[in-house]
Amino acid sequence: MDRDNKVLFSIISKCLILIKKRYGRDINLDTIPTDDEAVYKLIMTDTGSDVFALEHAKYAKPKDEICSTEIRHIEAMHAIVHRSMHEKYCQYVENKHDPKNIEYRSDIEECVLAETYGVLLYVEQLVEIINSYSGISKEVSARIAKYIRKGMQPELSVWKSVFVVGTQQNGYTQEQAQQIWEWLKIEGELTTYRDIAASAAFTTYQCYWLKTYYPNEYKDALVPNVNNDESWSGM
């Protein structure tokens, strides 16, 4: 767990204790809806830096342009910023606002990449595409994905021929298979694990949910060493 998430978890814990103390309510954040329009409105308009995972300036523009109505948008934002994917950010925003212009090379890519508007963001997507095109097992596809992300050229040279042959057996020409391989090497290098992005996204959403519905308690939870003292409430 990185520093930002540790800080956020501490804030969330303090906030929940304050809510329990003041209102007698036990809030289970694991069960809150993740499609709350009021929460997304705050995410889009909030200019504060107290949600620490979003305090860095590089999050400001992606937050405004990506995080609109679904938790997957927040996941994408964290993935893009975490790996500094500027070109993918531009492509994601453009495709998100005009999905009719997305062009998929195959049904395989449309099936895997539709939820990220045709942009390869996650290791899990990379593994799925390798497996679906070539028939290489998921386990080995995951190993190839690792080689791609780490730029391990000797290992990739060994697996290129296996991928190309397998893809040809699934109905693609040698030229098409080689083009797909090169595309995977380029686009797959900056992918991130979805579970990491999902965890960061849900933590971010939880903070904004608390900030939306319990703003005083959330504010008080930000105060260092507050110890849940009512004198800090500002109520």
Q: How does the language model describe each region?
A:
Residues 1-235:
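Noncatalytic, beta-rich nucleic-acid-contacting surfaces in large DNA/RNA-processing enzymes
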